Each structure stands twice: as C-alpha cells, then as structure tokens.
Design a protein with these regions (language model features):
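An acidic-aromatic
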Residues: 58-107, 179
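N-terminal leader/targeting segments and the immediate start of mature chains
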Residues: 17-39, 44-50, 196-203
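Flexible, surface-exposed loop/linker segments and immediately adjacent secondary-structure boundaries
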Residues: 95-139
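Sec-dependent N-terminal signal peptides
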Residues: 4-14
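Gly/Pro-enriched, hydrophobic low-complexity segments
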Residues: 120-203
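Short, surface-exposed coil-to-beta transition loops
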Residues: 54-56, 73, 81, 150-155, ...
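One face of beta-strands
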Residues: 34-42, 55-59, 68
C-alpha cells in the first residue's frame, strides 16, 4: 500500500511539473513574437437573456498593451495599456481612464503582456493555471487569485493551434457572461509602426 501511494505521489508530481514546464514553454515561444496584429471577431454571450452580441475589427497585442479597433457594428478604438485605457471615437475624441489603480484593467493587459514577454512566473503568482496540450495545440485556463479581480472576472482561457500562437481567448465574467475572441490573419512585426504606437498615447 505504501509503495502504491509512493508511485501515485511520484506520478502526480511528475504531471504537475510537466504542466508547468509546458506552460512555460508556450510563454517562451510566444515571447519570440512580442508584437501580434491581425483581425478579430468578438462574441459576447449574455447568459441571462441567452443573447449573442457580435463585433469584429483589427487588433494589436504588444508589450505596450492591447488595442481593439472595432469596425463592425460600430467603429471605435480601445487601447488598454498598463497605466491607462484610451477609447477613441470616430470623430477623434478620446476618453482616457486612469488604469494604474484599476486591478481589472491591469490584470487583463498584464496577463497578455506577461505571456508575450515569456514571464510565466508573474502569471503563476497572480493566477491558478490549468494547462493542457495535444500535439501542438494547447489551452490554458487562468483563474485569478485576487478576490477583487475574481469578483468581476471568473477566468481567462487562452488557446492556440501551435506553441507560438494565440488563436482564441475566452473571458468568463463572474455572472456567467462570456466574451470570446477569435484571431485570424495574424502577423508578427518586429516593431509597431508609428501609427500603431499612437493608439497607446493620449492626445
């Protein structure tokens, strides 16, 4: 019995170590492309009324933050940085929100920034992580440890068809609503253009 228990304990430890190593290896591969641009589709599912809200546009993931350039159904630009959230309307007017003291904004932006910079340790510090992979496809479900964040955001699921790509993100809110992003036509520029960098600068 003791021998059986020891074997089970050993295999559990090996499995846990393999999970950590695999997730770290994904972050390491993602860090090879610190900038990712492309097209996105977003589906927000409102659980209470069983309704889907669809939108689409272009996006930027970079160490500066995340930018959503929504083109349908209504044009708007939302840039989420580490210190501010900038919403730009079609007429050029901006609404700037200080995000330096907002844990939710910092968490969302910081999560992707940590993944694309290879900083898995930071993610393990802030989230409980369930990682699985099959061949080159992978999926990571991040559950926030911070109660303030968990009160709003239940989990962030990130997945890819290869170790160096993010193809889908599903954010589940505490009330059960979900926001699903699918990414296509992805490109990995070494540097952002001046126009792309300008999204993260308040005028």
């Amino acid at each position: 019995m003791k021998k059986y228990f020891s074997v089970v304990l050993f295999m559990s430890c090996v499995f846990m170590y393999a999970q950590e190593t695999n997730f770290k290896s994904v972050c390491t591969k993602l860090a090879e492309h610190p900038n990712m641009t492309g097209n996105f589709t977003q589906v927000k599912t409102i659980k209470k009324i069983n309704r889907n809200l669809n939108s689409s546009g272009t996006f930027i993931f970079s160490l500066d933050g995340i930018m959503w350039n929504t083109q349908k159904p209504f044009p708007s630009v939302l840039a989420v940085g580490m210190t501010s959230v900038i919403q730009t309307m079609p007429d050029g007017k901006q609404n700037v929100i200080d995000a330096s003291s907002n844990r939710i904004f910092r968490s969302i932006s910081g999560t992707l920034s940590s993944m694309f910079s290879g900083n898995a340790e930071s993610l393990y510090s802030d989230f409980n992580i369930e990682f699985s992979s099959y061949g080159k496809t992978w999926n990571a479900v991040l559950t926030p440890k911070d109660s303030t964040i968990a009160a709003v955001l239940s989990s962030i699921a990130v997945s890819g068809e290869s170790l160096s790509e993010v193809d889908k993100i599903i954010m589940t809110e505490s009330g059960g609503d979900t926001i699903t992003y699918n990414f296509t036509d992805k490109k990995y520029p070494k540097e952002l253009t001046a126009d792309e960098k300008a999204y993260f600068i308040a005028k």
